[in-house]
A protein has these predicted regions:
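RNase III-family endoribonuclease catalytic core
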Residues: 2-130
Length: 130
């Protein structure tokens, strides 16, 4: 059973995702995929910053005060902005009244919770989410 399914099945139990060396390796690996230089990865994964990454993987149900809600809002806005920007850059023919509706639908579909859940699954986030 996947971590996502386990978390759903145990919705009354608060799951605490791991925050040890494997979590740091996940974060470092994501930065490597983004082509960050090793010196920046070292800075961004210091103990203080790892606390912020931990917070970004913690739901309000797991910790009322230290959770990802503010990061979620910032991320949703950023993702939606990227989707719109990319659609117009990649498909300039969408820059018309009919295209606005198409781009709005793309933003809704790709910015949906299920899309982000699939990305989290593909990147192996579930063992680390609390």
């Amino acid at each position: 059973m996947s971590y996502k399914k386990q978390a759903t099945a145990m919705s009354s139990i608060i799951y605490k995702g791991t925050r040890g060396p494997m979590f740091k390796a996940l974060i470092s690996g994501l930065m490597e995929r983004g082509n960050l230089k090793d010196k920046y990865i070292g800075i961004l994964t210091n103990d203080e910053n790892m606390k912020k990454f931990s917070k970004a993987f913690t739901a309000a149900s797991a910790n009322k005060n230290e959770n990802y809600e503010i990061y979620e809002q910032i991320g949703d806005v950023s993702a939606n902005k990227f989707i719109v920007w990319y659609a117009y850059q990649r498909f300039p023919q969408l820059n018309c009244p009919a295209g606005v509706k198409v781009v709005a639908r793309l933003r809704i579909n790709y910015g949906a919770k299920n899309s982000f859940a699939q990305i989290a699954d593909d990147l192996g986030f579930w063992p680390y989410i609390s």
